[in-house]
Amino acid sequence: MSNASKFFTSLAVQLTYNVPSLRQYICEAVTKRSDIASLSLSEQWRRLVLGPISNLQSESCQSYVLVVDALDECEDDKDVRIILQLLAEARSLTTVRLRVFLTSRPEISIRYSMHHILQAEHQDFILHNVPATVINHDISLFLEYNLGIIRQEWTLGADWPGEVVLRQLVLYACGLFIWAATACRFIREGRRFACKRLDTILKGSSSAITAPEKHLNEIYLAVLEHSIFSGYSEEEKEEAYNMLKHTLGSIVVLLSPLSTSSLSRLLHLSKKEVDQTFEDLYAILDIPEDSTYPVRLHHPSFRDFLLNKDRCGDFWVDNKEAHQILADGCIQLMSETLKKDICEMQAPGSLATQVDSSYVEKCLPSEVQYACLYWVQHLQRSGAPLSDNDRVHQFLQAHILHWLEALSWIRKISDGIIAIHSLEALISVSLLTIYYETLTNLY
């Protein structure tokens, strides 16, 4: 997840499934504070994780490991520091042995935060310092296992793909597991054309001496190019390219993942168009069978690839333009959806905490909640100039109160206040008067 708002609540849910004896204590914590999801990260950690685990009996002598993968994908450096500080408190437990296994790219905020944790409380393991022979051996095992599954599925013969090909693939991977994983998914998605796709990789890959990044570029390009049907006319190919860049560009700059259903509504496309665009992209996208579950990238390196013009050529996505598309989509969706008393309570003063969350989600679907939370951030990142009587001006004039009301229903009114302060740096004096007058009239 790109933000930490659901980090500890997600962890608590997983604990209830994997450690049944914790379920009672976690449920009690939620019962005591029904608004627990809106509390600070430290409160969530202590009420949902640390507190319940401390209630376990010491006689069980159990050891537990919390696995936190890719912490660097959390965009807020402050949240990263808080999470690391809180996780370090795991050592304070006396009734059970709790350890944290954490992976991350070596971003500055991560390294800085780790340096402020006592050396005795953590061990660092730098992947780049692992001998190449060890990594290549592991990649070879990974490839052998996954290609073996493909061999069995399509009865490709006991000697497929063979030791020589396996060694070639290990060389092409250049120590990158993401290359090996993407290659295996690409081959497997080819189904009866699995052998042909393997040949595409072998013929397309440049010399093993080339930098690892180039090999990753080649495998990503192969996946994208195969998603465009070669039998299309030039005009149809152009349309397919544009749709691919439009939808993938949105996926890689989303500030929180969305389902294909929500994404289609946010981009004002039919769900069929989005599904058809993504149907050959399972090698790079994690697309759940349930269309209400969010779509995610298999690896953040694809985001880096797609936003770099030098690496992906015709598939390049302009970062600012992608944010502009999402900002426009958010504003249009909110303008079409938001209204006074959107939850139809017909009772001024109703508290969000007293209304069932499923009812709120029915009135404010995921894509509308996303638009309310992130439209200002997308606007900021687009770098687009604003002026009087433009779409932002018109939206604020018509819907600022409806927007704030929606945020209050999803218990994110503080995000609205932060967004309003952010708008001050973007909009003109005449625009500022709109919401200052509106907010003044509230009191």
Model-derived regions, located:
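DHp/HisKA dimerization-phosphoacceptor four-helix bundle of two-component histidine kinases
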Residues: L171-G175, Y370, A398
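Conserved NB-ARC/NACHT P-loop NTPase core of NLR-like innate immune receptors
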Residues: M1-I325, E344-Q346, A352-E361, D390-H393, ...
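Extended alpha-helical scaffolding segments used for macromolecular assembly and cargo binding
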Residues: G329-L396, H402
